[in-house]
């Protein structure tokens, strides 16, 4: 076990994590030259295009150190984005060390800090690396100061490297061997292996990526998941070098994969502990009683409705979501019906990036045409009789009279930006009902800490943050608590009928403004009818905004010329009567753009 090192790479988006991983794989001869393509570990197209890592991947590398010994290095790739923080914490808890990669030209960014704190909390040895040293504007001294200031780890012997040119790669590998501890664990104890990641393969079912902590697992043995209690046969084992290499057994300290004929991803939950079941006398000694710490069920935070543009596509959308869920266990969905949009699904996501990626994968990999409703968050509603109910769909919110209080999710937001943009970012955060908790200067960077309602972030906070800071600000957030808030449901009515898909939940202080904005936008979109159409925004029975689309009408008195006024009145009254009858039986169709209009109303 002393010759095994498990490590991962922590970096902000675009700081060169995947390129560095490629270089390390190449240096250790993990792939032949011809198989070496850019970003070997990012296997999804969307990962390569957006330059982000979504799922954790691994590579087991053999490295001959300068002292002549051969070491087994297991590189566990981690996602860098804040939405995937649970996957990051699982990847990191499988490691003893981490390379903290910082772009020498840009310095420390928000998600680096968030993930680095996770690593330090888990007791992982962090080795700082300054990447992109080949750039003319690299400023290693400033980057070192920022690492020490913001993260608080010693950066005097940070390794300078450039993943692009290959400079400093050997120094990194030596540091992994010298500065990171070997795995801790009991090779002779009962088997305990943690699932770091799992994905679905069409030929063999679910593939689980595991880190064996104690004991050993041989091919063909019976394994048990401790969170769900289900048992399976370990049909095949192996390691990734990134290509897969079958093995007869996995020992304590190793990272490898297990294929056990599992059909659905729900059974292999990320972070769960696997142990052995052995029959016969003394078999109990092989079964662990205590699972590994840190496992938790992932809870979605952002909800939106997904509807097919054609009602006949509903079944194929369901199939697509089922297939997508095989590879993305954090996606939640359930069928829902809307009067305006027909049949569709209410989906739960980890965050906005996760929502975008799911939408994009549905459209790209499954050819779906989708309508997405405005994203909303889950509210805790305390009803008048004292029962607490979770509401994530605005149209399911009970009436004001039956409510005691509504609690909304509050998150702690960390914002990092250069000093020049502090004023603009603070103004934006205050508009979004943020409460400033802290402000700290680190060299040229400033870190602001706010408490904000998640509902304000999911609408368009990230886009606005980027625009007021010209793209320099970065953010990450974590859930804090539910807190009582004065939020109301604004319904949109057409001729007195509610349109369920257009309901929104907003803070009372913004309800007038948002209601008026939606109503005036709707007036532009809905076409004129033969009778007046009243568009109203209402809170309960209290109308807060109204616009009227005037009827198209024929000039019925054009043929009269002179003549008696009573004759004209008779014709006008007859027309009025006809319009009234029409209005009773007519219905207004809501065009597609109306639902998108809600998204575009600036808060």
UniProtKB/Swiss-Prot annotation:
Membrane topology, from the record: Peripheral membrane protein
- Which GO cellular component terms are attached? plasma membrane
Which GO BP terms apply?
A: positive regulation of translation
Tell me which Gene3D superfamilies the record gives: 3.30.70.240, Elongation factor 4, C-terminal domain (3.30.70.2570), Elongation Factor G (Translational Gtpase), domain 3 (3.30.70.870), P-loop containing nucleotide triphosphate hydrolases (3.40.50.300), Translation factors (2.40.30.10)
Q: What is its EC number?
A: 3.6.5.n1
Subcellular localization(s) per the UniProt record: Cell inner membrane
Can you state which reaction this protein catalyses? Answer: GTP + H2O = GDP + phosphate + H(+)
Please name the CDD domains in this protein's record.
Answer: EF4_III, LepA, lepA_C
Gene Ontology molecular function: GTP binding; GTPase activity; guanosine tetraphosphate binding; ribosome binding; translation elongation factor activity
Instruction: Describe the location of the tr-type G domain by residue ranges.
Output: 2-184
Q: Which Pfam families match?
A: EFG_C (PF00679), GTP_EFTU (PF00009), GTP_EFTU_D2 (PF03144), LepA_C (PF06421)
Q: What class of enzyme is it?
A: hydrolase
The UniProt keywords, alphabetically, are:
Cell inner membrane, Cell membrane, GTP-binding, Hydrolase, Membrane, Nucleotide-binding, Protein biosynthesis
Which positions does UniProt annotate for GTP binding? 14-19, 131-134
Q: What does this protein do?
A: Required for accurate and efficient protein synthesis under certain stress conditions. May act as a fidelity factor of the translation reaction, by catalyzing a one-codon backward translocation of tRNAs on improperly translocated ribosomes. Back-translocation proceeds from a post-translocation (POST) complex to a pre-translocation (PRE) complex, thus giving elongation factor G a second chance to translocate the tRNAs correctly. Binds to ribosomes in a GTP-dependent manner.
Which protein is depicted?
Elongation factor 4
What organism is this sequence from?
Answer: Albidiferax ferrireducens (strain ATCC BAA-621 / DSM 15236 / T118)
Upper lineage is:
Bacteria, Pseudomonadati, Pseudomonadota, Betaproteobacteria, Burkholderiales
